[in-house]
């Protein structure tokens, strides 16, 4: 059995891929699948390098992302590149409308100083997460909402589950698994990346608590570059 913690876009992708390989998947989140994660607020664009236009190749992407200070390697960039078309397939299978030109190609724009038109436009992007949630449930992936993970459980050197509580009922919950994918968020939005100190005035999800750092650390994982990456919390 596989266990995917937090139901943002990243772990939804992991859950879908695992399920399609025949794994029994349980997905848990402290919120609700239909609205959790950064994507829960909607999104009107998706980045994909498709070899269909000028400056639209992996080499263009590699030159942009793999720099001495980015922390991104050739392998990381290539794995990202390989996942783009499969992700597009899932999005369209979910019923998400990616805008197209009359010739059938995607409507795309350049952005963020990137050399090519890598950003595909999405119609009614506020529906993205709810449609992905429906797609996940139709695959038969089990979902536990409102479950806040407080500690990872170990069996030797591997993660064997987690414990936490239902944020609405207060019930204590234990999950056991053979393999875990943990994607609790990128930063700690309540403190480090919000200069106004207003908790909901931020770009990404305001509900990222820093547990993506402390829970693996408590379980014995190494944490690198926390002092320079602005991902910490008080």
Q: Where is each model-derived feature located?
A:
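Generic hydrophobic/aromatic pocket-lining and core-packing "Φ" positions
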Residues: 14-15, 88, 213
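Short hydrophobic core segments
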Residues: 3-5, 174-185
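N-terminal Rossmann-like FAD-binding beta1-loop-alpha1 element of flavoenzymes
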Residues: 2-27
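Conserved N-terminal/central alpha/beta ligand/cofactor-binding core
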Residues: 30-151, 155-160, 164-166, 171, ...
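Rossmann-fold NAD(P)-dependent oxidoreductase module
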Residues: 17, 135, 215
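Glycine-rich loop(s) and the adjacent beta-strand/alpha-helix scaffold that form part
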Residues: 182-234
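Short beta-strand "acidic-cap" motif of Rossmann-like dinucleotide-binding folds
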Residues: 24-29, 223-225
